Amino acid sequence: MSTAPDPESERLREDAQREKHWSLWGTYLSERQWGTVREDYSASGDPWTYFPHDHARSRAYRWGEDGLLGLTDEHCRLCFGLALWNGADPILKERLFGLTGPQGNHGEDVKELYYYQDATPTHSYCRALYKYPQRSYPYQLLIDENGRRGRDQAEFELLDSGIFAEERYFDVSIEYAKATPTDILIRLTIANRGPEAADIHVLPTLWFRNTWSWGAIEEESTVRPSISAGENARLTAVHETLGTYHLAYEASNGAPECLYTDNDTNRARLFGVANERAHVKDAIHEAVVLGLRAAVSAEATGTKAAVHYRLSIAAGSTVTLRLRLTSAVENPNALFGARFEELFAQRLAEADRFYAGRIEPSLDAARKQVVRAAYAGLLWSKQFYNLVQSRWSSGDVGHPAPPPGHAARNAQWMHLYARDVLSMPDNWEFPYFCAWDSSFHCVCLSKIDPELAKRQLVVFLREWYMHRNGQLPAYEFAFSDLNPPVHPWAVWRVYRLLEIGQQPDRGFLERAFQKLLLNFTWWVNREDSDGNNLFAGGFLGLDNIGAFDRSKPLPNGGALRQADGTGWMAFYCVHMLSMALELARSDDVYQDLASKFLEHFGAISVAVNGSDGSGLWDEQDGFYYDRVELAGKVEPLRVRAVAGFLPMLAATIIRNEDVEQFSGFVRRAKWDAKFRPAQLQSSLQVNANGTVHLLSVLTREQLERLLHRLFDEEEFLSPFGIRSMSRFHEQHPLMYVAGGATYTVDYEPGEGTTGNFGGNSNWRGPIWLPINYLILEVLRVYHLFYEESLRVEFPTRSGQWMTLGEAARNLAHRLQSLFLPDGAGRRPSNGTELRYANDPHWRELILFYEYFHADTGRGCGASHQTGWTAMIADLMNLEPHWTSCKPGFVGE
């Protein structure tokens, strides 16, 4: 049997070693640039109103581009995407439509049906599907009906409109395959699923991002590029730094024509002033949909061009269109023909081989399909992200200054300079990086593209992202907001995963560790300002989980000490300790830092468990609660939320054999045990023979009491995972009076019923993959220590007792069931829509939602959150190992 690496792995190696630039091109084009903070130059800071969907077809973007299932280079200079028209829509379908935050009854929401079906890390093969209705798209109906609905009602979706009745729609599949890093084959397959022949206009479109309208731009060419008619049925695109590319197209299937214009704003339409260019961004729309042929260039040149196919497709029939985007230095023997199809087959076979080596072979076919789809979504969600904060704040040279108030947003982040391909939470709903989401992305990515995972973890720690004070940027709406500090966990996790069978990348670990020291210090100085080792932290990514907005001062003027904030900092210490000990293997200096984090962990553990009433542990309820301190009094907020389990996450295994070489560390630990016994006694347990230690915030009794609630189906245990809020609050809502107002916390298993944080998120009941993943992971840590000596009742009161490893496996199965078809073919995440169970053109399609209804499993929020919901791939890959001690899967 050959031991040679598979071709995709070899491409990854060539790219990492800069032998061949396979990552130059990829599906890095955003699904939405309109309505983003980057494009918002208003005084009010309302990006949805300032740059709505209706402007997107006519207005040049300043900081990026978007398109339908498109492709671009790593600096988003030249873009390729689809445009479609069914002859009935009022506009070309050039980009995905969705409701803005104010329009949706649960915040912003994409109202399209599209699916990321396959992808390889180098984008040597990618496939996606868009379902395009044959009737007029119901833009206004979606806006009006959702506007009529309250937050306590279901969202009105595209399928609810009846537009897909009688299967009157097209399946539009797009595939990309790379022959070389700069020779990209494109195949469009359009299938008429309806009962009658139907017409469709298909416009593969090539355009340059507008970098010439804004004056001198850092690192960008300001020379206007050009796209013109080339020889032998092709477009020729010339760019100062990218070079020359040709888009060849088959001159068949309706004898296509080429339409040319410029990617410049239609000022006349939007602002009622004269256009600076004769041909503007929306000219192709005007020519095709409105019949205004004079709108496009008669000279066959511009910065945007489309190949216009007019197709009539019989019922049940399929048409295939072939294109090829190549650098001028390439000279393929035959652009199309048999070799074209052979190369697609070859790249797909190579993708199969690549994933066969990265998906657990013992998984059944249904699980393998979910894992592959999760990886596809993760790779399609890589996006070119560009923002120079100082330039955004001050405005562009030669342009009017932004209005007063504009520069107030992120005013403390003038150093931030982003010009990278990054993994996005969701390419439409969240087309911007989120620091804590990114950590989960990188852990998942490390299985298939380890260099990208490491690079993205490091880039947020670099001086052009990280603040000089050590804070990591949260997200573009407010870089200074606080996200859970999971970055050290991700760094350690990625390092350990890649350590198995490979040479450890200590350079990566050390680079990250040094910068994380700055971030840790920032947290301690800012969020533990009283020095009592109980932390605040604000909303910490859990949005509406508290009684009030935790990112703002308390309405009664008190101080909030958070169970999750304190738990996260203990979690931080655990992973910094693990990294310091690993680095100490080759540099004794790190022993001192390991001692520092052991000591700090002990201090946090003592504080959070304070027996004198000063801590967050409630002995009566056996739970961790947030605490309000006001006028010398302490009051627990008795909200049974997943935040109360976060101190449980701070646990790791320390074996004598692993630390015996660190004499300084061991000596210091013994000193602490002798002279600060309360600190280590409360956080360090040892096995019977004294060779293995468990470092944990929790005692065994506390762990058992927490797990009693965690595994209670009347509280946190759902058929589909761990709820973010106890079901107890459904009948017993918490009422808290502060500042003359009453705040209520109750159990809401699906979408949120308030407008907090935009209304499109809810941590008061639903199931969230990232927290479930961390709970599963730490259960394995506890299992490695306690083994058979600790058995729990799962579910609580069921009479079924099992080890923590077995409980973790059971919980993992519940999470997996969200995505797996049941006996009737229904995936719970798809809700009650029967098409996904019964229709052969729908039942293999899988969406990865932001969160899930705790009682039904229905997907909620963003529908393409791969993103952190791709972590289900890791859970499935772990399937055979839940009760084993396989190294590398936990931070022992």
Residue ranges and their predicted role:
Residues 72:
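Active-site-proximal polar cores
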Residues 2-62, 75-78, 83-892:
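Acidic, mature catalytic/reactive cores of soluble proteins
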Residues 65:
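Transition-metal
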Residues 68:
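Basic, low-complexity intrinsically disordered segments
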